[in-house]
Amino acid sequence: MNLGINYDRILNKAKYKYVIPIIAAKRAETLKNLDELKGITEKKDYVSIALKELENGKIQVKNSALLDSLSK
């Protein structure tokens, strides 16, 4: 399943390349938990879905000011 994820577009929104996998993993975990609560047992690629949501701006980086201060 290729969702056509453009990592450069994600980098423009998140700035820090090491934050992107953390955000995607947390969102993927949330998506999986939501599906389990709904009783959906279908296998999905939750990380790809989360990366696509990040690319499309559906999820955003919280505390970007804190990240900026830590990087200095």
From Swiss-Prot:
Subunit structure: The RNAP catalytic core consists of 2 alpha, 1 beta, 1 beta' and 1 omega subunit. When a sigma factor is associated with the core the holoenzyme is formed, which can initiate transcription.
Enzyme class: transferase
Keyword Disulfide bond: no
Reaction catalysis annotation: RNA(n) + a ribonucleoside 5'-triphosphate = RNA(n+1) + diphosphate
Any one of the GO CC terms: DNA-directed RNA polymerase complex
HAMAP family: RNApol_bact_RpoZ
Protein name as annotated: DNA-directed RNA polymerase subunit omega
Family, per entry: Belongs to the RNA polymerase subunit omega family.
Entry EC number(s): 2.7.7.6
Gene field: rpoZ
Keywords assigned by UniProt, alphabetized: DNA-directed RNA polymerase, Nucleotidyltransferase, Transcription, Transferase
Entry function: Promotes RNA polymerase assembly. Latches the N- and C-terminal regions of the beta' subunit thereby facilitating its interaction with the beta and alpha subunits.
SUPFAM superfamilies linked to this entry: RPB6/omega subunit-like
SMART domains (alphabetical): RNA_pol_Rpb6
InterPro entries, per database record: DNA-dir_RNA_pol_omega (IPR003716), Pol_omega/Rpo6/RPB6 (IPR006110), RPB6/omega-like_sf (IPR036161)
Coiled-coil features, chain-numbered ranges: none
Superkingdom of this protein's organism: Bacteria
Record GO terms (molecular function): DNA binding; DNA-directed RNA polymerase activity
Pfam families in alphabetical order: RNA_pol_Rpb6
Family annotation (Gene3D superfamilies): 3.90.940.10
Gene Ontology biological-process annotations: DNA-templated transcription
